[in-house]
Design a protein with these regions (language model features):
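C-terminal and inter-domain tail/linker signature
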Residues: 2-165
Length: 165
C-alpha cells in the first residue's frame, strides 16, 4: 500500500477545491486599471472571453478583443491624474464580488467611457459606484458597473442642479 501517494492525491484534491480569494483578484484587477495602469495585466485577471458593461453610459466591451480595446482606448491610463477611489463596502460570494466605492477626480480631460464627447470642464467630481464582478474560478468573467449619470452630469455643469435635485 502506497500511503504517500494517497496523501499526495488528497493534498492535490484539497488544493483544487480551495476557494479563491476573489477580493484579492478584484483588488489586483482594479490596481491595473487605475493605480498601475497596464492593459495586459488587467486582461490576465479575466477569462478568455469576458465582458464589461458600464451601464449608465452603455460603454464597455464584449469578448477578449472588445474588452481589450475598451481598456486600451477608454479606461486604462485614461483617467485624470488626481483620480482617487474610496472603498465603502464589499460583499464576497462564492463566485461574485460586489463593491460600493466613491470615485473622485477633476474633469480635466475627456473621459470617453463616462462622458463620451464631453470636453473637460475642470469641475471636481465625487461619484458613488456599485461594481459587480462575476468570477469563473480565479478569473473575472464579467463586470457590471453602475453610477448615477444625472449626478455626474450635474457635477460637471451639464445638468441644472435645481432640476436634478
Amino acid at each position: 500500500m502506497n500511503n504517500s501517494g494517497d496523501k499526495k492525491r488528497q493534498r492535490q484534491r484539497k488544493q483544487h477545491h480551495r476557494p479563491h480569494d476573489l477580493g484579492a483578484i478584484f483588488e489586483k484587477h482594479v490596481k491595473y486599471e487605475f493605480e498601475d495602469p497596464d492593459v495586459e495585466a488587467t486582461m490576465k485577471t479575466m477569462v478568455k472571453e469576458p465582458y464589461v458593461h458600464h451601464v449608465p453610459a452603455l460603454t464597455g466591451g464584449i469578448g477578449y478583443n472588445g474588452v481589450r480595446d475598451f481598456y486600451t482606448n477608454q479606461l486604462v491610463g485614461k483617467m485624470p491624474a488626481d483620480t482617487k477611489i474610496q472603498h465603502i463596502s464589499r460583499t464576497v460570494g462564492k463566485d461574485q464580488v460586489v463593491d460600493e466605492l466613491i470615485l473622485r477626480f477633476t474633469h480635466d480631460r475627456e473621459i470617453k467611457f463616462m462622458l463620451p464627447g464631453i470636453p473637460p470642464t475642470g469641475k471636481s467630481v465625487e461619484l458613488p459606484h456599485v461594481v459587480v464582478m462575476k468570477f469563473n474560478g480565479n478569473k473575472i468573467a464579467h463586470e457590471h458597473i453602475y453610477w448615477d449619470q444625472a449626478s455626474l452630469l450635474a457635477q460637471v455643469g451639464l445638468l441644472d442642479k435645481k432640476t436634478y435635485l
